[in-house]
Amino acid sequence: AQHGRAAAVAAAIKRCRPDRTVLTYQGDGDALAIGFSETMYAAIRNENITVIFVNNTNFGMTGGQMAPTTLPGQKTTTSPYGRDCAVTGNPLKAIDMLKTLDIAYAARGAVTTAAEIAKTKRYIRNAFEAQLNGEGYSFVEVLSPCPTNWGMPPLAAKERVASTIQEYYPVGEFVKRREKRHD
């Protein structure tokens, strides 16, 4: 799918092939910047797809620019003095928005420790189970380090996720509706 259009393409595939398991794997820009409308409207329609969203708080594949998820004060190539929320607005908390909708499942995990990775794997499994059971839209946000664009060694980046990013974006299951949707 074109950048930002993954949820729309996934919804179309699922409607054409409802017997298939359909997922998107998206980053900050794809899911919450250029693809924000597609991500949210797939959720609003409760499309029976699974979205895996990797949040590393920057546009990691294009040079580390500020993303919708960039934390207050975080320096990026386009916010060299740190994100100023008075100018750019606050970071987008996608799950907080999704919790207001009639979706099947929403969770946020991290890849910082073996225990957190195991929980995140369980969240992803739960998201796919929701789709396989015909319950509707499922969304898993995965907090991930970005050592290259954060300008730090991998272990320090992992610690930053655990100490700073998880404080702003807490992990856990936030929506867990276990009933088949009504079409």
Question: Model-derived features: where do they sit?
Answer:
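Conserved thiamine diphosphate
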Residues: D19, A67-N133
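Short, structured patches in soluble enzyme cores that scaffold and shape functional sites
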Residues: F53, G109-A110, E141-S144
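Short, hinge-like loop/turn segments at secondary-structure boundaries
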Residues: A42, A67-L71, A156-E159
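Short, well-ordered, mixed-charge alpha-helical segments that flank or form enzyme active sites
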Residues: A31-I34, N58-G63, A114-A118, C146-W150
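"Short basic amphipathic alpha-helical interaction patches in structured regions
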Residues: S37-A42, Q65-A67, N149
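Flexible, low-complexity linker and terminal segments
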Residues: L132-D183
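Structural motif
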Residues: R20-L23, N48-I52, D96, A104-A106, ...
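Thiamine diphosphate
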Residues: A1-G60, R122-N126
